[in-house]
């Protein structure tokens, strides 16, 4: 079974990816892991990627696509299937993935799209606060401190609402064309992410069991 998982930051994609890999015994192919392995093994694409990373530059699409192709060419993929997580990030990468799968005689069986309302995600992701003296982490809504005084707490730049909103907006702008692309192929299965973690996985499990 060859799968792709998608979802906005904070939607629980990483948690559900781990559950899918564990339950269905497919290879978990995440962008970070692929890059680390390719660089450690000094593959052709890994060496190229490292040259950009060492200069503090973004790795070009053709190198990222090449690293994905190297990983999908490995023997375990035909035996176990895979779950792609964190790739493709752009519609151009999605088209490159289509071409790679065709060249390797592979095909996607399904795209799991974890849907959560962006406003809920904004509240979830921008609520983290840190106590100035102890460094303890709390959440304004889900785990508020008993003795909250605003001056005793601070937020990291990454957690500020305007920063989180920008990140969500970028992810929506990049992700929606990819979802539309796979929806036209009849591959997308929408899963409601605004529920208990185990309920989300039950919904995914039901979809994937029917795909097998």
Curated annotation (Swiss-Prot):
GO molecular function, one term: ATP binding
Region (NMP) residue spans: 30-59
Family matches, as PANTHER family: NUCLEOTIDE KINASE (PTHR23359)
Keyword Translocase belongs to the record: no
Subcellular localization: Cytoplasm
Domain of life the protein comes from: Bacteria
Reactions the enzyme catalyzes: AMP + ATP = 2 ADP
InterPro entries linked to this entry: Adenyl_kin_sub (IPR006259), Adenylat/UMP-CMP_kin (IPR000850), Adenylat_kinase_CS (IPR033690), P-loop_NTPase (IPR027417)
Domain notes: Consists of three domains, a large central CORE domain and two small peripheral domains, NMPbind and LID, which undergo movements during catalysis. The LID domain closes over the site of phosphoryl transfer upon ATP binding. Assembling and dissambling the active center during each catalytic cycle provides an effective means to prevent ATP hydrolysis.
TM ranges: none
Keywords, ordered alphabetically: ATP-binding, Cytoplasm, Kinase, Nucleotide biosynthesis, Nucleotide-binding, Transferase
EC number: 2.7.4.3
PROSITE patterns assigned to the protein according to its UniProt record, in alphabetical order: ADENYLATE_KINASE
Binding site for ATP: 10-15, 128, 137-138, 195
Protein name (record): Adenylate kinase
Gene Ontology cellular component list: cytoplasm
Family that this chain belongs to: Belongs to the adenylate kinase family.
A UniProt-annotated Pfam family: ADK
Function as written in the Swiss-Prot or TrEMBL entry: Catalyzes the reversible transfer of the terminal phosphate group between ATP and AMP. Plays an important role in cellular energy homeostasis and in adenine nucleotide metabolism.
Gene Ontology biological-process entries: AMP salvage
This protein's pathway: Purine metabolism; AMP biosynthesis via salvage pathway; AMP from ADP: step 1/1
Region ranges (LID): 127-159
Lineage start: Bacteria, Bacillati, Bacillota, Bacilli, Lactobacillales
Coiled coil: none
Oligomer status and interactors: Monomer.
Positions contributing to AMP binding: 31, 36, 57-59, 86-89, 93, 156, 167
Provenance organism: Streptococcus sanguinis (strain SK36)
